[in-house]
Amino acid sequence: MRENRPVIALDFPTLEDVKAFLAKFPADEKLYVKIGMELYYAAGPEIVRYVKELGHSVFLDLKLHDIPNTVKSAMRVLSNLGVDMTNVHAAGGVEMMKAAREGLGDGPILIAVTQLTSTSEEQMRDFQNIQTTLQESVVHYAQKTAEAGLDGVVCSAHEVAKIKEATNQDFVCLTPGIRPAGAAVGDQKRVMTPADAHQIGSDYIVVGRPITQAEDPVAAYHDIKAQWNDQ
């Protein structure tokens, strides 16, 4: 189920910024993009419709976490938008995740967030009061996600092998925190290069600033895509 296109995180504040960025790419180049909270809350459903009308694939990254019925209803709305992928927080529980699957239907990919890539083991223990290792926590959440009937998880590339071993090889692992060699790590605590993620078995990678803030975003995208596909 591996996706050969890096997923571009559209971390922009407005629809106009997105339009300007996407206009840099040839019209026949179909991208896979991530729309997160900032952009969705600023532009609303229109941003999803606009990107889909251009023929691009959309990962709507809202990380839903609420009571099962509320999440189910919200997912039904997102399904009508035509998103290709969306997510919930695994910490919401198995029943919530099952409700999300029911609301979204069987078409779009539904994944769960395990531990954010900005979370360190020290933070997890001190703030969340989880006294296992970070990797054990992530694998536990992944197993519960599979039990709920979801397609996969958001996880660091460091946990991919253990997750697939604990679930199955078709279980989707989407990896944020990807940076080309030599790039600044920003606010991500656990990062890897596109080539590393390829070797370790990630199915999707998410790349933001190294593409969106590059002097030549199209060239940066193609370079990262080549690294991701081990070319």
UniProtKB/Swiss-Prot annotation:
One of its GO terms (molecular function) is orotidine-5'-phosphate decarboxylase activity. It is an enzyme of class 4 (lyase). Pathway: Pyrimidine metabolism; UMP biosynthesis via de novo pathway; UMP from orotate: step 2/2. Belongs to the OMP decarboxylase family. Type 1 subfamily. Homodimer. NCBIfam families: PRK00230.1, pyrF. This is Orotidine 5'-phosphate decarboxylase.
